[in-house]
Amino acid sequence: LNLNIKFYTMITLDNIENVQKEWGDSLVKLGSLKSNKEACNNEAESLINRLYGYQNGTVLFKPTKAKDNQFRLTFEGAKSYFIGENSNFSEDKGFALQPWTNVRFENASVILNEKSATAMGNYFFTEPNGNVVKVEYTFGYFLDSNQDLRINLHHSSLPYSN
């Protein structure tokens, strides 16, 4: 008897919201570590390794504050955006080192498929003085071979102002 049974995990809204919270918490943690370069570097690498899919293939990452090197298609490019200190991305000052005291996601909508999902909305970054910065996002997610949810699309932009 050969039962060829496959178990599939369907991506849920809870999965998306958990990864969004983990991403925001990691960004806040990076800012709190900015005076300890080694710990900050380790946390940045951990964030990217845990949540992004660079080790699985292409990641399309367009950060908010990137003009000269707009697209971060490599692990090193993403890391530089978050914590700076990379001469190949000299415009980067380290977005996560602002620092931020809170990051809150507000999904406008989410498209859920069996092995992939897309979320679009606004996220809100709170500065130490309480000022809140609103940023628009689109994130794409996929399940890797271990059924871990990973980011393979990340586009951020500041809202249009006329």
Named regions from a protein language model:
Residues N36-N107:
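A solvent-exposed, acidic/Ser-Thr-rich amphipathic alpha-helical stretch
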Residues L112-M120, F124-N162:
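Short beta-strand edge/turn micro-motifs at domain boundaries
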